[in-house]
Amino acid sequence: MHGTRASGASRRAFRRLRAYEKALDMPELPPRARKGESSIMGHTDNYTLLCDFYELTMGNGYFQTGMDQQICYFDVFFRDVPDGGGFAIAAGLEQIIDYIQDLRFSPDDVDFLRGKGVFSEAFLQYLLHFQFTGDIWAVPEGTPIFPGEPILTVRAPAIQAQFIETYVLLILNHQSLIATKSNRIVRAAQGRPVSEFGSRRAQGADAAVLGARASYIA
């Protein structure tokens, strides 16, 4: 890339893309993906609908069959460390705590889901009052972790434990990956200064900021 000014061809291509999306009547983003402000990344800090759709359909199934309050335990772990690294570094717990504390469905969220036509009305009303009431145990950030051992354990009613799965894995996998790589680099540097330039190749602004955070923890 040799500059930041968009060429005429790029602008025309962008306009064609917008026109194409409009012609297809593509659905809007979930409402809360467009609102709010985050203290760390400068945009939405409510990720309630950042989940795999099946988490919601399974929750609907739990609710309809009376299993929604069944207490269950989920363990987060990994199976191996690639390249003979021996151990990984845990990171991302702060973002998971923030997510759990802010986990709410707004009326706009529920209306968005109602429009999908696959959820019972009783379940949608339940979501309006959804609140995580379970317990979570986790190793501190920066802790060396090893294959097969629990990194984070969730004890909660089935519907709640199921719903947070996507975000917990997203955050732990990404930040622990970056922290582990950074730890290897720092150890290889043997006391020499190390700089973090992850933003240049990160997969988006969120990954850049949270990756830098994970590198610092390592």
What are these language model-derived features?
Residues 38-73, 80-82, 118, 124-133, ...:
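Buried, small/hydrophobic-residue-enriched core segments of structured protein domains
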Residues 7-10, 30, 38-39:
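Serine residues within intrinsically disordered or low-complexity segments
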Residues 72-128, 137:
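N-terminal, Lys/Arg-enriched amphipathic/low-complexity engagement segments
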